Amino acid sequence: MGIDSAHLIAQTILQGFDAQYGRFLEVTSGAQQRFEQADWHAVQQAMKKRINLYDHHVGLVVEQLKCIHSAFGYDEEYIAKVKVVYTGLLPDYPRFEIAESFFNSVYCRLFEHRNLTPDKLFIFTSQPARRFRDIPRPLSRDFFPNDNLALMLRTILNDLPLRLPWENLERDIYYITDYLQQTFPVGELLQATFQIANELFYRNKAAWLVGKIRIGGQVYPFLLPIHHNESGGIFIDTCLTDYADASIVFGFARSYFMVYAPLPAALVEWLREILPAKSTSELYMAIGCQKHGKTEYYREYLAFITFSKEQLIIAPGVKGMVMLVFTSPSFDRVFKVIKDQFAPQKEVTQERVQECYRLVKEHDRVGRMADTQEFENFVIDKARISPELMEELQKEVPEKLEDLGDKILIKHLYMERRMTPLNIYMEQVEERKLKDVIEEYGNAIKQLAAANIFPGDMLFKNFGVTRHGRVVFYDYDEICYMTEVNFRDIPPPRYPEDELAGEPWYSVAPNDVFPEEFRHFLCTDSRIRRYFEEMHSDLFKADYWRALQERIRSGHVEDVFAYRRKQRFSQRTEIETYSIAKVSA
């Protein structure tokens, strides 16, 4: 096949990407209406639909290419020509970076993730100089207090596109003004510039106003989550200006935002200033471009191994019965490979484990489940693998290994953010932090349950602690929907000797769970038991879990807050009605 056919193939792939991103924007643009109508089930469906759009369109393009030329894929020289032609289509293309990832996905689908080399794939971007190009149209508007902060805030909020009444706009303006005046020097605040993104960021049951405050030579986040009340009005729930708070809002354990972004690279660069700790991959994922986020994720790994001389090692912590986990001492991610054989007590299959990871990808993670990136045929230099890890790989996952001489290929693995295992964290911290993390752990369980997720194995080793001190679940092999579980009370013993028997005196079905038992394997330490009884004793009662199930079955969708409850304006003690005169003071 000649150069004309290469043009045809390249154009077909790019047109397929155009179709995919057009549908992506179409689903995203419906976020405002779903929010205004408080159609939370439609929000969940749209989230799952948008995630699956990408693979669907990759499949459509692959079928087209097979029709164009059934032999396509067996001539490696020809594939390199197609990539050259495709690269030539990108210099003036507004979403070139994601178009490159789409090309990669089509290639991987055609060639079953084989021969992943830079001449056939965009391992690195073809146009690095354009990554930080000028934005063709402003992504935000500038607002100035001009000695009247409240008036400026009123203008910002009244300019929002939402077609819903405010519950009490003057109260909310007072709360925001008061918070800002307590956070920043008042004189500097009145001379600040507020840059407000043109588009709202939608997720779960909230619409987020995202902005920046330029003050005193510094730039701070300015985030306002907007929620519904029960009467159809809207209100501002809090104001966040701290980098750590903003990082949690855009965190890796949360669902992707719905934000209209025809130029995602421009939005990523705009966000970077208020999320300096976030990598490029995390920013793309946060705005819903998760497949390109995966491309950047891999590039960040390549950058790490290029500049680091560390070897990959077995990850610290208790070894898993289902997963072999490894990392590098200073790398912020871990690699997880499904073992060829599981421990006898694990009644799951490899297929079931992969289904669990897909469920987490598509479900609302409520800030409590780590996002993962799935890779096939992952190649690593043998020299970068420690002897202990190599031995473990050959022992636990030999069926997933392929020897390539000085390299080794792992047929399937996951990569996710590295955290401190909760059980290790609890052994190392002082009393105050121990109490805090027990509170966090219980909150994580409750928030997952409210989102219709039952973790299955609730042992501390299956949870991690982030750099912000949040507890996140990361072991998914026993995960299931809350509505699939039968929560039972333990029946009273028939005879005194029943309690001494090695086997239960009552029947147990596969989906039966007895919350009373949680106390025995979670509270072996008296300090932990005391904190659990103080803050989360309801987790040990079957009635609590059954009540949650009823709420889920009735269609109730819980609110999810990406910040501490004490930060909510509704927790303030001031009187809620204020005159405009006081607001403006």
From Swiss-Prot:
Q: Does the keyword Cytoplasm apply?
A: yes
Look up and give the organism this protein is from: Photorhabdus laumondii subsp. laumondii (strain DSM 15139 / CIP 105565 / TT01)
Instruction: List the protein's name.
Output: Isocitrate dehydrogenase kinase/phosphatase
Extract the HAMAP family matched here: AceK (MF_00747)
Task: Please list the residues that make up the active site.
Answer: 371
What the entry lists under InterPro entries is as follows: AceK_kinase (IPR046855), AceK_regulatory (IPR046854), Isocitrate_DH_AceK (IPR010452)
Q: What is its main location?
A: cytoplasm
EC id: 2.7.11.5, 3.1.3.-
Gene Ontology CC annotation, any one: cytoplasm
Q: Where in the cell is it found?
A: Cytoplasm
Task: Describe the reaction catalysed, as an equation.
Answer: L-seryl-[isocitrate dehydrogenase] + ATP = O-phospho-L-seryl-[isocitrate dehydrogenase] + ADP + H(+)
Biological processes, Gene Ontology terms:
glucose metabolic process; glyoxylate cycle; tricarboxylic acid cycle
Tell me which domain of life the UniProt entry assigns to the organism this sequence originates from.
Bacteria
For molecular function, the Gene Ontology terms on record are:
[isocitrate dehydrogenase (NADP+)] kinase activity; AMP binding; ATP binding; phosphoprotein phosphatase activity; protein serine/threonine kinase activity
